[in-house]
Amino acid sequence: MRPLSARPRLSLPTLACGALLCACGGPTSTPAEKAAADSAPAADTGPSGPQPWTRALPASALSFPAVRGWETRRLIVHLHSPWSHDACDGNGFEEGVLNEPCLQDLRAGLCDAGVDLAFVTDHPAHAAYQPYDQLWHSRDGDQPLLDGGAAIGNTISCADGRPLHWMPGIEDELMPIGLRAHVRADPVENDVMYNRFDAEAIDAVEAVGALPFIAHTEQRQLDSLRAQVEAGVVGVELFNLHAAFDPDLRDEFLGLERADWLGAIAPMTAPTGTAEPDLFMLAVLREQTPSVGLWDALNTELDVVGVAGTDAHQNVLPTSLRDGERGDSYRRMLRWFNNEVRVPAAEADDPLAWRRALAAGRAAVVFELLGTPVGWDVRVEGSRTLELGETAPWTDHPGASLQVDCPRLAAASPKGDEAPEIDAVVFKDGVEWARGCGAHPLDGPGAYRVRFDVVPHHLRPFLGDDPAPWLIAYPWIYTNPIRLRAAGR
C-alpha cells in the first residue's frame, strides 16, 4: 500500500484544463443490462410532475417516509476540515491561523446537503496537535454533542433550524471515526499512533471510543485487511471519491482509464455547456471493483461494514463553474452521495443511535445525485426478520427468503417527465445470484447484499444538448449484507 503522504492529489492545472477547456462529449461506457422499472405508486407526499434541479437536499425527516417503522438518516464518512494539511487549497491552517471562510463553506455545505451526522476525519499532521475539543471547530450558537455529560462533538443549527451533528476523527493508515478523546496525552505520540495501522493502533482508537475504519480500500490487500478486521476494524470503503477522479489511482488501483472523464464533463463544466454542473460526477460514477471485491471477500468470513468516503478537501478546482460555485465545493461533493442508516422511530433524533446503526451495518451507500430513493427495503424473512448488517446461523432460518423492495424516486426529486429504469441485483458472497424485486428463496449460507441500479431517464432535462450518452445504468444504492453462516462459521 502506498503511504498516505505519498498518495497523489489531483493536479489543479490538469483538472482545470480538462474540466473547462476540453471539447464536449459524454462518457464512453455502454449501458448495462437492465430490468423494467418498478411501477409501484409513490408513498411520499412531495409535489407531482417535473421538478427543477436543486442545489440543496431537504432534511431527512422530510425526504424519507418510514419503512416498516424504520427512519432514515444521512451520514457522511471521510471528510476533511481546515485541520487537514491539504484542505482548503493547502491553506487550511497557516502560521497558526485557521481558514475561516473555508470552514464556513464546509458547515454550509453539510447543511445544504441535508446531512444529519458528519464523521469528519482530518489528517493527523495538524489534527493530532490540537486539543480534542477543538477538533470540531465550535462557533457561536453551536451546542456540544454530549454523551453521558461529556462533549464528543458539535451540533450546528442549520439555516432551516434543523440540527447538524459533527463527530471528529482521523484519516491516515487507519480511519477512526467518532473519537471521544485523543489516543495519547502527548501530541507527538498522537501523531505517531495515528500513522500506524497495526493491532496496537486499532486497540488504541477503540480504547477512546472510536470506530476503526479503513479508507482507500482500493490500495489494500486481502490478507492485511482480514488481519485488521480480526483486530477490530469495523468497516471499509467500497467507494472513494478521490480515487474515482485521481488519474494515478484510477490507473494503478482501479483498472480504469486515467482521465477519460476529463473531456466527458465539459457539458457540465465548460462556460458554453448546457448540462447541470452538479452532475459532472456521473462521468466517474462506476463501481470500484477492487474495493467492492475486497469487501465481499471479507464478508464471506467476517462482519464488515461498507461505506462510501466523500474525502472532500475543497482543494482541487477553485475555478467557478456556470452556477457561480467552485467545481470542488464542499456543498457540491456532499450532495453527491451519503451513507443512509435505518433507526427505530424512537431513535430518529439520536445521533448516537445513528452511529450504532452504522457500526451494525444497518446502512447503505446512496448516490443521491441520481435522485432521492424512497421505499426501498432489503430483509430476510425466516423464523424472524433479519435486517441489514445482521448475522445469523443458516440452520435457524429454513425456508427463508430475501425480500427485495425496489426504490421509487421521491416525488420532490429533480426530474422531467420520463421515469427512471430501476433494477435490483442480488449478490451472494460477491457473485451475482439473482435479479429483480420481490422474494428470492435462499438456497444456502452466504452473505447476501443488493445493488440497486438506475438508468436516470428522469434527469434528461439536466443533461444538456446531448443527454443520450449519460443515460446508462449507474449504481444507485449499495446495501450492506445480511449474513447467514454455515455451522462452525
For every predicted segment, state its role:
Residues M1, C22-S48:
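Ser/Thr-rich, Pro/Gly/Ala-heavy low-complexity intrinsically disordered linkers and tails
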Residues M1-P8:
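N-terminal secretory signal peptides that target proteins for export/translocation
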Residues L4, Q130-D133, L225-A227, T319-S320, ...:
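Short secondary-structure transition/capping segments
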Residues S11-A23:
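Bacterial N-terminal signal peptides
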Residues G46-T72, I76, H80, S84, ...:
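C-terminal functional module detector
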Residues P52-D260, T272, E276, L285-G293, ...:
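A metal-dependent hydrolase metal-coordination microenvironment
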Residues L262-A266:
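Mixed-charge, low-complexity intrinsically disordered segments
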Residues A270-T274, D278-L282, D303, G361-R362, ...:
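Flexible, glycine-rich surface segments
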